[in-house]
Each structure stands twice: as structure tokens, then as C-alpha cells.
Amino acid sequence: MSSITIRGCCIGAGRPKVILPIVARTEDDILREARRLSALKADCIEWRADWFSDVLDAAARKRVLSGLRAALGEKLLLVTFRTKAEGGETSLTPQQYADFCGTVCVSGCADLLDVEFFPNQEELPALIGQAHKAGVAVVCSSHDFHKTPSRTEMVTRLTAMQQTGADLPKLAVMPNSPSDVLELLAATAEMAEQHPETPVITMSMGALGAVSRLCGETFGSAMTFANPGQASAPGQVALDVVNEVLDSLSLE
């Protein structure tokens, strides 16, 4: 599996990098949480902008992005607008989504931008090109909150995301049996072994899939989301547990 380095953080090599989400409604609460999370043992902070009550206000977006960058220092900042169709709080029109991504890219504050794969097929080349021109890495994401596709389908989806030019394909699926969790792990290992052009981020959601968030170094998932107090997705494990298990399972 290849790796990318951002702000000295090597994603795709060694211990999976830990991401902490910020899910807050107001500018003050977002920045207060950012200051709290900046002191914790994690590599990256994700701003879930779909939770922000003023997300349609471009000036408010810019203020939050600037405040986040100041609060986080050298921690990585991932900016995500998760649409309702992909498990988020709300949705935007295609133009609103493009405007949001544009604000993130030109702000100079974000290190990574999440771009959803399925809702944005036609716009993906332009969105990814804009991000790369601004020096922002792209996480291309896909979520299934109902089931786990076959291993073949998951690998096909991840390789399709690679082919968009995204830096980090991300796949999150819902297991309905232990075998589903194994399928996700097998697909992850296949990507690392047979399609190593980019690092990937994968997870099996819910309590049943929680183990997948802890064994990324073994199977090939480059980053994992931890719960710093309020989870942004089902099955996120508490930060102290994540760090303890990642250290225990380290291959180095």
C-alpha cells in the first residue's frame, strides 16, 4: 500500500492515523470542541459541516475554517459535508455542494476534503481537480448503512474511487453478520495487496463491525475514526480504547 504525507503525517504507513469528528451546531461550539480535541492523542480532526446550522453562509464557513486552522495547529483538518443520502444531517443542491467545496479549497485551511462518490459522479473530476490545485488531498467516500456488498463489489467500488484521482478512497458498510465483517476485511486486504496505488480507509459499522476500526494496520486501512465524546457514525470506539488497541496490535 502506498502512502501520502501531509504536515509530516504519513498516511498509509504504520499505525492507522486516528480521526476525531466535530459534530456541533454553532460556530462557538465547533471552535470550542476543536480546542478541546487539539490536546488529545489523534492525528486528524474532521469537521462535519453538515451539522453546522449556518453552513449555507459562505462568510460563516470561512470564519469556522479559519478558526479551526488556528485551533488545531499542525493537526490535520479533514472537512466533510455528509449528505443525508450518505448518512448525514442534511443535504445540499449540487451547486450548493460545489460552492461548499470551493470555499474549503480556497480557504487555505483544510488539509483534506471529503467528496462523496455516488452523488457526485459527473462533478467528481472538477471537484477533485479544484482541490488538488489548491493543495488539498481528497477523500472519496461511499457509505452503505443497510448492508455489506460482496467483496468483489467493494473492491470494484474502491478501485473506481482510485481511478477518479482521489488520494484516499473511503468505504463504510453495515454488517448483518460476522461474515460481513470478514468480507470487508478481506476486501481491504485485497486492496492493499493488489491495488496499492493509494491508501484506503475502510470500516464495518455498528457494534458488530467495531473490530474493523481497530485492526487497520493488519488488513490495510490507513485511518480510523474514534469517538471523542460524541460519535458521528455507528460503532465508533472511544478514543482511549482505540489508541490502546492500535498500540497493542502494532506490527512495528
Model-derived regions, located:
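Short boundary motifs at domain starts and secondary-structure transition points
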Residues: 7-13
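Short beta-strand/loop segment at the start of cytosolic alpha/beta domains
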Residues: 1-7
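Catalytic alpha/beta core domains of metabolic enzymes, predominantly
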Residues: 102, 112, 117-252
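Active-site beta->alpha loop and helix N-cap motifs at the rims of alpha/beta catalytic domains
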Residues: 3, 14-133, 143-147
